[in-house]
Each structure stands twice: as structure tokens, then as C-alpha cells.
Amino acid sequence: MNIYHKSLWLTIINATMIGRSLGTTLPPNRRHNRIKLYKKLTIEEMGKLSAKMDQHTLRRRDIHRALDKIKDAIPGISFGQAQKGLNVLLKVHWFLYHKGHPIGSELDCPLDSKVLGSLGGPQIRLARIDKPMYMTKQEEIMSHSQVRGEHRVEYDRIWDEDHLRDEGLL
């Protein structure tokens, strides 16, 4: 992992707007340092997981362990908040370098308000999502994705395409 990876990954994490969600749950006097720690840990874990993806040895349990590590290291964040940045980075890495490789079946769909809203039921904030609820949501996503012949990580591709269309890029 070099400076360019870190810079790109930081830009992507910032674009996910996870700081907004973290800002609503972290104490004001600790918010800045904890968000910095979140970004640092997410980038460190991404370095390890992207190397495994590149070697085609990445497993879903590796991702979940990394998410547990991030969540446990930062008081006041939920599993739902911990997952956002890392899952987006893994998704981007897979689409750029490994699209079509079966390793995509190991990846989860990044949860956000749009994805959660598409699953129906009451709207749930990332701050309220614990690991069991996260796993349940990923299984729901898997059911929908299988119907379309896609991996879980591709479930939110529809909104990516909509956004690009709105910007005149598709």
C-alpha cells in the first residue's frame, strides 16, 4: 500500500459521508479524534484485505473480523457505521481490479439509507445496526441479488448508475 492508495481510499471514505453519521453519535469533545481513528483503521484494514483480494484468498470472515476490530477500537460507533467505509473500498477495488472473479461472492453490499430503504420495513439508521442485524440485512440483499444473477456487492449498482445518469456521465 502506497501513498496513492491511501490518498484515494481517504477520498472515497470522505465521499461516503460516514463522518456525518459518526458525528451524530460521537461525543462532541471526542468526535474529531475518533473520526480520524476510524479513517486510519479503515485504511489499515483495507491494505490487508485488498492484498488478500489480489491473492484471491479473501474470505467474508476476514472482512467481518476487520469490521469488528474497527468497531471495538472506537467507543460509540456501531457495526453499521464501521462497515460503510471498508465495504465501499472493497467494492471499488473489486470492480476496478477483479470484476467477474468469483471472489466477489465474499464481499458484502455497503449498507446505507438507500440500500436499507430498498429492503422495506422501518427505516433503520446505521448507528442502530449491530452485527446480527447487519448479517440479516446482507442475507436479504443476497436473496435479491441471486434473482438478478449478481453478487451481494453488486446490489446497489442500480443507484450508482442512476447517479452517473443524473450527472450526464452515462
Model feature map: region roles:
Residues N29-A73:
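A glycine-rich, hydrophobic loop/mini-helix early in the fold
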Residues M1-G19, G23, N29, H64, ...:
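C-terminal accessory module of base-excision DNA glycosylases/AP lyases that mediates lesion recognition
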